[in-house]
């Protein structure tokens, strides 16, 4: 945040010219507790400089005649950053934004400090949004697309503030100087935003996800007494998103207060929400909009749970490979019951898990 216009200079540390103005390298402290360190020429910023704002954010770059010009870096108080092009102190031109881990989360253009033109928003899970933003810089319009983590399959259509209202199945064929080119799948299905509630898992429970349908299928598990399992439809590299875990959204308190038998398909989404696939939706013939709940537990898993922002389901979990998997290989995850919380006979976990744990520990001791 640049509050320079609203502040009054309090102190100057450094060289002054004959008129008492900063000249050379100086530190200027403002009454707002903002601070600027950089080069001055007779009271105007000229050369490299950096603002330190009261909220912990910073802005650095090259100044000409008291205004930021060219490439500048704004670092947010949480450590994320915006690398942009400045013209007379305003963001105008190409820009990239990065999260606190240094991952690219935005690429596009700015005009007069507002996102402009065709922009890309990147999610940590590998998915992305692309389209021409509106006059407020929001991803709103009828030519916006969500692109799945494979960078190929997409849902193209109408979005409001980055949320899909209606998307048609499409293929991203090319990207030319940041501008994507899509081909709609002939007679392809249309998808709508369908975030679950505590009582409704989906308005179209038998409408499968196109990305997931290319990568996994359900069959009898190879694990003894495990029922159905989730299998790879195609060979996939490590770190590939394979499947999605949607469910009704209930509280941790509700889960903790009921019997283990009712928690066979629950997974924690965050500190407040648990995703649950209850009966009858645990049957593939009643619910196949997402299949992540079909993955069975293993103490030597080839996959892991991860968070995912889905264009249809909203914030959910996904199943991501931890190593390369072969076609028709069963996908397994570690269910992650807490071994430090013990009951009378072992960890606070269902009986089948305790039995598998005992057997696994026995093999490790051989």
UniProtKB/Swiss-Prot annotation:
The keyword S-adenosyl-L-methionine applies. The keyword S-adenosyl-L-methionine applies. Residues 214-336 form the SET domain. Transmembrane segments: none annotated. Its EC number is 2.1.1.364. It is found in: Nucleus; Chromosome. Gene3D superfamilies: Histone H3 K4-specific methyltransferase SET7/9 N-terminal domain (2.20.110.10), SET domain (2.170.270.10). One of its GO terms (biological process) is regulation of DNA-templated transcription. InterPro entries: Hist-Lys_N-MeTrfase_SETD7, MORN, SET_dom, SET_dom_sf, SETD7_N, SETD7_SET. GO terms for molecular function: histone H3K4 monomethyltransferase activity; histone methyltransferase activity; protein-lysine N-methyltransferase activity. The record marks 245, 256, 266, 317, 335 as: Histone H3K4 binding. S-adenosyl-L-methionine binds at residues 226-228, 296-297. Keywords: Activator, Chromatin regulator, Chromosome, Methyltransferase, Nucleus, Repeat, S-adenosyl-L-methionine, Transcription, Transcription regulation, Transferase. It comes from the Eukaryota. It catalyses: L-lysyl(4)-[histone H3] + S-adenosyl-L-methionine = N(6)-methyl-L-lysyl(4)-[histone H3] + S-adenosyl-L-homocysteine + H(+); L-lysyl-[protein] + S-adenosyl-L-methionine = N(6)-methyl-L-lysyl-[protein] + S-adenosyl-L-homocysteine + H(+). CDD domains: SET_SETD7. Histone methyltransferase that specifically monomethylates 'Lys-4' of histone H3. H3 'Lys-4' methylation represents a specific tag for epigenetic transcriptional activation. Plays a central role in the transcriptional activation of genes. Also has methyltransferase activity toward non-histone proteins. Belongs to the class V-like SAM-binding methyltransferase superfamily. Histone-lysine methyltransferase family. SET7 subfamily. This is Histone-lysine N-methyltransferase SETD7. It comes from Xenopus tropicalis (Western clawed frog). The gene is setd7.
